[in-house]
Amino acid sequence: MPTPLRASPASAAPSPLPQRILVVENSRTHARLIGEAIEQKLNLPVVYAATLAEARAALERHPDWFMVVTSLVLADGSHDEVVEFFLSRQLPTVVVSGVYDDGLREQVLRRQVVDYVLKNTPGSIDYLVWLVQRLERNRRIAALVVDDSRSARQHAAALLAMYGFRVIEAADGEAGLAMLDANPDIRLAIVDQEMPGMKGHEFTRRLRARHARDHLAIIGISGTSDGSLVPRFLKSGANDFLHKPFSREEFFCRVSQNIDQLELIGTLQDLATRDFLTGLPNRRHFLAECHALLPNTLGRQQSVTAAIIDIDHFKHINDTYGHEAGDVALKAVAQAIARHAGTQDLVARFGGEEFCALVPYLGESESVDYFESLRAQIEALEVDVGGPKLRMTVSIGVFRTRFPGQTLNHLLSEADRRLYLAKAGGRNRVVSGG
């Protein structure tokens, strides 16, 4: 089942990850082709250099570097000097070359270079953009390596770290399960077959029973020649399998393919459950989540507060400022609602200019204060629509109950009735009684 979509409260944001990319290329035309594709498709800042001297100056000007894309042919450095210059600064480095040379490729990949990419070939720019995006996203993903061989485990972990993953290691299946429980952000598991206590395919079976395919990718690995092992892993729930020894490039391609598929599934789930304009959960998903929350909360005689929030005079906003401005207004209100909501609150765009919230555990006066605060925050917004700042207000109907047996339809109907009273009473107000 997909993870419930709930808005989180505003909190101290984690330190932002470095975003700046250095493109080092003696051909300024090709440098621009690479850099502009990255900027346009990924919205990441790019700085250019044509020599190691220019690269050194750029690195000294800015502290927040994410990675480097560099040619091996520079006026002031040999192949080895170029690679060493960037790796010594612990920057993820992708090398681009105009010619394919097996010896040079092997020489480069023996270092900690992320990839060796041919330029001026069909699709090379698209591949570079994909690679940069993959490395950028990997920084937010944790990966688990489960292998009883310390050297093999550390080898796989080092490769994953090179590709930007946060890596967690375990020497056997039981330790691996404990690591999964302690680190819910793990999205990838690399699992060896031969381990004491629990074979890799059995660990995979137990892992898959806890984590669905839309949450966790599992790749089995083994050096055995047993032909039955691959289907055994796959039937136990693995997404893929690699035979040892494997090349760096094959490992990265398999890992990336599986993570790409996880993200595609997540995108499709978002399309099915989120409102495309505001990013809030949509009506259908909200109702499903509410039906799950309501019996548990009211069954323990805890309170639940339902609210319907409607933008006042929204038609006037569209008619006066245009429909694009109306969309901007909807997004601004949605963002205010999402910032205000707590981790257990359910919020959604219901349709048009109407939003809905279901908030557990509020006291009677707290429920009014909660939505009065939201109303005031929205009233204080000044929305940029390309001219005079847009100001707007909302009316909110609120209904609170703690009685078991109350249906969601009843809660929403009562909240809607109070919304009507708020509109009739002059708008820009919260009505909870009546």
What are the residue ranges of the model-derived segments?
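Conserved nucleotide-binding and Mg2+-coordinating catalytic segments in signaling enzymes
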Residues: 269-288, 309-323, 331
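Short regulatory alpha-helical coupling segments
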Residues: 269-270, 283-303, 334-342, 360
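Active-site-proximal structural segments of metal-dependent nucleotidyl cyclase/transferase enzymes
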Residues: 289-321, 337, 348, 367
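Active-site-proximal alpha-helical element of nucleotidyl cyclase-like catalytic domains
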Residues: 325-346, 354
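A short pre-motif secondary-structure segment
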Residues: 346-349, 390
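Catalytic strand-loop-helix junctions within cyclic-nucleotide turnover domains
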Residues: 358-367, 386-389, 394-411
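Catalytic-core segments of nucleotide cyclases and related cyclic-nucleotide turnover enzymes
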Residues: 368, 401-434
